[in-house]
A protein has these predicted regions:
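C-terminal non-catalytic regions of proteins with extracellular/luminal or membrane-system context
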Residues: 1-6, 10-19, 37-50, 87-335, ...
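A short alpha/beta connector and helix-capping loop motif
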Residues: 20-33
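Long, well-ordered, tryptophan-enriched scaffold segments
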Residues: 26, 40, 45-72
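Generic alpha-helical segment signature
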Residues: 33-34, 55, 89
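Short coil/turn segments at secondary-structure boundaries
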Residues: 54-58, 73-78, 108-111, 278
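Helix-enriched interaction subdomains in cytosolic or periplasmic regions
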Residues: 67-95
């Protein structure tokens, strides 16, 4: 009533504990379906705790939504081909990726350089989180193939296996040998959907130890390491940030992830993405550092100081602030002078 909203109110999945009480509170559609919901409504109706008016109002809103949907579907015209949709997915990934670090302008990589691509995510990228967000992509290419298509000489090494959705060390020696004989090494790491999903919180901002150890091992034999991160939220990169030349944060950017990564690494596209959240230096710098939850519930005593506002208010310097993102463009300002615009 306060917001003037007259549409359908839908619950989050599994959020309704009592269907009849939720109906009185304004929930029209409780998800997912449960046969117990009907029993609760019938029981409360027989007891006089809800009436026909409560039911009719809710059903009326649902019918109105169904009519609007049917009308919208009849007017919908899909004009994009599958190829055009994929091109859009690649462009969205290119414009969403964030370049966090680029020392000595290691990126973009020249085509005469030999590249070692290391990590299972290079072959099978994790481009979405777990839970209701997961979809089956129609197209997914390996980073090696994408770089080869752009004319690069590429060697691949696994470096780790993804077993039960956990990164496990595998073929470290071969990965290090491969990195040593190439001009630069692109190490692809990140979090699997088991770590980044709905219903639970992460217990750490760090990457899996197998990923961090792989980066450090490769950095010992090759001074030109480029780390590509596939993850759904902030990552603590302090363990390897000082050992590598570049960090490219791809996030979870859909089916075009590796094509976009190749375009960014090659310089075919210049990075333009900006962070949508602050990346702290460590978990201890966050507002939740002193109140580790149980993974399923959380309190927010910081009030309105959620996210980047907390760091500004507390004076804690983050690793990468909200809105941060590098590009391949260099700007130089010299001798600025004010102009009188009153004339």
């Amino acid at each position: 009533k306060e917001f003037g909203f007259d549409g359908v109110v839908v619950s989050d999945w599994g959020a309704v504990k009592h269907r009849a009480k939720s109906l009185k509170a304004g929930i029209d559609l409780a998800m997912p379906y449960s046969a117990d919901y009907g029993k609760q409504l019938a029981d409360w109706y027989e007891k006089g705790l809800i009436d026909e008016g409560d039911l009719d109002r809710s059903v009326g809103r649902l019918r109105e939504l169904a009519e609007k949907y049917r009308s919208a579907v009849s007017r919908r015209r899909v004009t994009m081909t599958e190829e055009q949709k994929h091109e859009l997915a690649v462009r969205a990934a290119e414009e969403s990726a964030v370049l966090l670090k680029n020392d000595d302008d290691i990126l973009p990589v020249c085509k005469d350089k030999k590249i070692a691509v290391i990590g299972g995510f290079a072959e099978n990228p994790e481009f979405q989180g777990g839970g209701s967000s997961r979809v089956n992509a129609k197209v997914s290419q390996s980073l090696c193939d994408c770089l080869k298509n752009l004319g690069f000489n590429v060697d691949f090494a696994l470096g780790y296996m993804i077993r039960y959705n956990i990164l496990t060390p595998f073929g470290i020696r071969y990965a290090v040998e491969t990195a040593a004989k190439n001009d630069c090494a692109v190490v692809c790491v990140g979090n699997t959907w088991l770590t980044e999903k709905e219903e639970t919180d992460r217990f750490s901002l760090k990457l899996n130890s197998a990923a961090e150890d792989l980066i450090l091992d490769v950095a010992q034999v090759n001074p030109n390491v480029i780390v590509v991160i596939y993850a759904g939220s902030a990552v603590d990169v302090s363990a390897f940030e000082g050992k590598v030349k570049a960090i490219l944060y791809m996030g979870y950017c859909g089916e075009g992830a590796n094509e976009a990564a190749a375009d960014l690494i090659s310089g075919r596209v210049s990075p333009c993405g900006k962070l949508a959240e602050t990346f702290p230096k460590s978990l201890e710098d966050t507002a939740t550092a002193d109140r580790r939850g149980n993974g399923y519930s959380e309190r927010y005593p910081e009030g309105v100081l959620v996210g980047y506002k907390y760091y500004e208010y507390s004076g804690i310097a983050p690793a990468y602030p909200f809105g941060y993102g590098l590009s391949y463009t260099c700007l130089l300002y010299t001798s600025p002078s004010p102009r009188d615009r009153t004339r």
